[in-house]
């Protein structure tokens, strides 16, 4: 009665017989009170935190703008090797090309030449969400990516703020926690990054979730999904529960067609929450099953067309995405962090500070256990697909989120229900935010020469775009007149960000199904041959981490992952012998298999002795630091 009287005094105007019994969870009680009071200030800190994170996300771009000044050519700063591929696919869609397209080979889906599904055409939602407004506004892919980086940070911060506010009921903790999760999530992905901090070294990209356009564009949906599931489980009215469950199911359905490593992580997390809820809170199985049923019905409805698209994928897609068969467990850094958090949580329950039945405790437990489940699903399924992505884009953030929730719950329990001191939260937040800003600024400074070189090289892509607009509409699809050889591989990789012409070979050519594994190898050898690479240089590149080692042996073997076979001398010698045979037998017929239309070389080092044996070059056109040639077969 005393508890009910207390609630009645706080909720004036309500009849005593209409007041529901108070919820045991402090987070749920505060949530209920905030809804009744309608306090408009509770979002103010969240919006401020989101704006701060958006500005933090743009620090590298600010650095490029300041260093280039009026010479800026419109390039976006990139910290991730794969961003140029997403920008190329986005540019293709913005240019009106079909969903199944290959921006590197220039091959599009057509009735007389159907293309198989690719990773990008299956996960099409983010691409079209960006491409449609970009096309309507006439925005190039680079500008879209710049805007997306800020918007993604803003939305992710707001989603995290909302989720933490639901769980903890503490607005200040929610704002500080959102910043902490986003700034420290990258650090939780790799143990070597923690060591670099202790030794005052740079940790690299401290905000990996901002990789564009995935997971950046849909990253916030993971936390939105968790918040909707919370609402569906803790709300009292059945109709409200089912409404939130339906919204959660729709969010999960969108994630399915957005990014594999987010929707599978969300599904694994939902499984953990469901098991915890059914085991610990046995008194409400009917409502929990109803909520899960609604979510799973919508999930299954989306999974069916997804499976159909997946069945139409290219046969080489599994190999290009490094799908392997293994049941070996993986103990990554996020897994260790999550298990340690779970141990702390269990200790707090054992000491009587917390209770398992508290929904906030169950949610903290679910986030702590998510890395162990996500990284080790192969123990059950037998399939292992690039688990490193869980460590960069989902499980690492879940482990830090668990730390924030557990820290807030324990501190509140030890302080007899009072909130964490505002000054402590402010100090910790400022330290974390300042460190992340320093890391982003330092990395932008270190990569400044590369960013400026990419920006200057964009002149070449824009010149090719101009030439395509001057050419007949059928010429671009004709590889004999438009195929580009670029001796600078990183420039060639980025050319399709703006230019519609296909390229001979780039490190990302294998990603799309436009070329088979055999054609990809043929194009690689041609690229090396025209670049005057001999067998000794080939062997040297194959022995060390390089674009060649990546192309020949794959990312996971190059990075010496424990579940991948090591690269030994016999492997290098075998590949070198194959390339040597190619050099020895190269002839006019092989040159004609992939006829070139354009050649791009640096203005200071444009040796093309092998290419000149088979092609005639025009006088060339100086474009920035490069020379653009038009070539024809002899």
Residue ranges and their predicted role:
Residues 1-7, 11-67, 172-175, 634:
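Start-transfer (signal-anchor) and selected internal transmembrane alpha helices
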Residues 22-25, 30, 51, 292-300, ...:
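Signature aromatic-anchored transmembrane alpha helix within multi-pass, membrane-resident enzymes
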Residues 83-84, 442-634:
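Extracytoplasmic
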């Amino acid at each position: 009665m005393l508890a009910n009287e207390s609630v009645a005094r706080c909720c004036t105007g309500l009849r005593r017989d209409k007041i529901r019994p108070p919820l045991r969870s402090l987070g749920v009680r505060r949530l209920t009170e905030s809804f009744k009071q309608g306090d408009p200030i509770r979002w103010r800190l969240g919006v401020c935190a989101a704006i701060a994170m958006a500005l933090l996300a743009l620090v590298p771009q600010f650095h490029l703008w300041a260093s280039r000044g009026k010479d800026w050519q419109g390039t976006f700063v990139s910290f991730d090797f794969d961003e140029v591929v997403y920008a190329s696919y986005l540019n293709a869609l913005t240019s009106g090309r079909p969903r199944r397209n290959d921006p590197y080979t220039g091959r599009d889906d057509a009735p007389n030449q159907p293309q198989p599904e690719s990773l990008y055409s299956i996960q099409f939602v983010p691409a079209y969400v960006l491409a449609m407004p970009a096309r309507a506004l006439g925005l190039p892919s680079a500008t879209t990516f710049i805007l997306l980086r800020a918007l993604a940070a803003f939305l992710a911060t707001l989603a995290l703020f909302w989720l933490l506010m639901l769980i903890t009921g503490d607005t200040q903790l929610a704002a500080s926690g959102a910043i902490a999760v986003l700034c420290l999530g990258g650090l939780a992905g790799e143990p070597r990054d923690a060591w670099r901090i202790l030794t005052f070294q740079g940790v690299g990209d401290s905000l990996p979730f901002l990789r564009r356009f995935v997971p950046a564009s849909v990253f916030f949906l993971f936390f939105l999904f968790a918040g909707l599931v919370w609402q569906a489980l803790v709300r009292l009215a059945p109709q409200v529960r089912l409404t939130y469950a339906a919204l959660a199911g729709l969010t999960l359905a969108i994630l399915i067609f957005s990014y594999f490593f987010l929707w599978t992580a969300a599904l694994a997390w939902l499984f953990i929450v469901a098991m915890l809820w059914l085991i610990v809170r046995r008194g409400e199985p009917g409502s929990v099953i109803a909520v899960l049923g609604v979510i799973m019905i919508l999930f299954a409805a989306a999974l069916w067309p997804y499976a159909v698209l997946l069945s139409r994928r290219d046969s080489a897609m599994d190999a290009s995405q490094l799908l392997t068969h293994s049941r070996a467990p993986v103990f990554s850094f996020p897994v260790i962090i999550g298990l340690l958090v779970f141990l702390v949580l269990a200790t707090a329950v054992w000491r009587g500070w917390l209770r398992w039945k508290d929904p906030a405790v169950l949610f903290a437990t679910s986030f702590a256990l998510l890395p162990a489940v996500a990284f080790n699903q192969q123990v059950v399924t037998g399939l292992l697909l690039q688990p490193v992505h869980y460590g960069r884009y989902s499980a690492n953030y879940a482990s830090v989120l668990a730390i924030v929730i557990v820290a807030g719950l324990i501190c509140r329990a030890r302080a007899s229900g009072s909130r964490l001191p505002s000054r402590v939260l402010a100090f910790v937040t400022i330290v974390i935010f300042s460190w992340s800003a320093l890391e982003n600024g330092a990395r932008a400074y270190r990569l400044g020469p590369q960013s400026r070189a990419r920006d200057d090289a964009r002149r070449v892509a824009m010149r090719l775009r101009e030439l395509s607009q001057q050419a007949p509409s059928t010429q671009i699809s004709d590889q004999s007149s438009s195929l580009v050889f670029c001796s600078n591989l990183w420039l060639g990789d980025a050319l399709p960000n703006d230019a519609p012409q296909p390229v001979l070979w780039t490190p990302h050519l294998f990603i799309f199904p436009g070329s088979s594994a055999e054609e990809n190898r043929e194009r690689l050898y041609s690229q090396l041959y025209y670049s005057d690479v001999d067998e000794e240089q080939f062997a040297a590149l194959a022995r060390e981490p390089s674009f060649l080692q990546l192309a020949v042996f794959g990312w996971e073997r190059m990075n010496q992952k424990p579940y991948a076979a090591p690269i030994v001398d016999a492997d290098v010698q075998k590949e070198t012998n194959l390339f040597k045979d190619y050099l020895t037998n190269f002839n006019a017929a092989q040159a004609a298999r992939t006829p070139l239309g354009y050649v791009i070389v640096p203005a200071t080092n444009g040796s093309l002795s092998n290419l000149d044996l088979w092609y005639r070059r025009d006088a060339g056109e100086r474009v920035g630091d490069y020379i653009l040639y038009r070539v024809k077969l002899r």
